[in-house]
């Protein structure tokens, strides 16, 4: 089953709506819930469709980061899952910045998990190989499971 989950911690110094907007800048979720963790809140946005990633698909092209993003996403595959993190503050201004460690995003990262039967197909759709910055192909969005 296709499933996309995006998680972000809201620190006490942050505005929850701004964190939600940072998520919305690249992800269209079906539902969002909030969990209390002491002074912090955890936002969990979910979707059961890859169409929720169409904004991410567009931003990867607009920002001309297909090659770097492809390498990052390919190394993020484990089994039928892709898991990666984005800098929350950069996402808040509508840009993408992949990070390897949580501390690279001072207010915490945005964690993205994509479950799909063949994650390489998802990576090929999101980030096709390029030649001189031009995609070698543009695949249709992978079919829903």
Curated annotation (Swiss-Prot):
SUPFAM superfamilies: RL5-like (SSF55282)
Domain of life (superkingdom): Archaea
Record organism: Sulfolobus acidocaldarius (strain ATCC 33909 / DSM 639 / JCM 8929 / NBRC 15157 / NCIMB 11770)
Family recorded in the similarity comment: Belongs to the UPF0201 family.
Record-given protein name: UPF0201 protein Saci_1285
Family matches, as HAMAP family: UPF0201
């Amino acid at each position: 089953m296709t499933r996309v989950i995006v998680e972000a911690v809201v620190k006490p110094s942050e505005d929850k709506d701004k964190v939600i907007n940072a998520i919305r800048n690249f992800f269209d979720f079906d539902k969002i819930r909030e969990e209390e963790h002491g002074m912090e809140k955890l936002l969990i946005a979910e979707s059961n469709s890859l169409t929720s990633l169409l904004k991410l698909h567009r931003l990867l092209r607009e920002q001309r980061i297909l090659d770097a993003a492809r390498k990052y996403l390919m190394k993020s595959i484990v089994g039928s899952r892709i898991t990666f993190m984005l800098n929350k503050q950069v996402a808040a201004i509508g840009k993408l910045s992949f990070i390897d460690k949580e501390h690279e995003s001072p207010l915490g990262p945005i964690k993205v998990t994509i479950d799909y039967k063949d994650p390489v197909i998802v990576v090929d759709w999101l980030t096709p190989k390029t030649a001189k910055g031009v995609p070698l192909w543009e695949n249709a969005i992978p079919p829903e499971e």
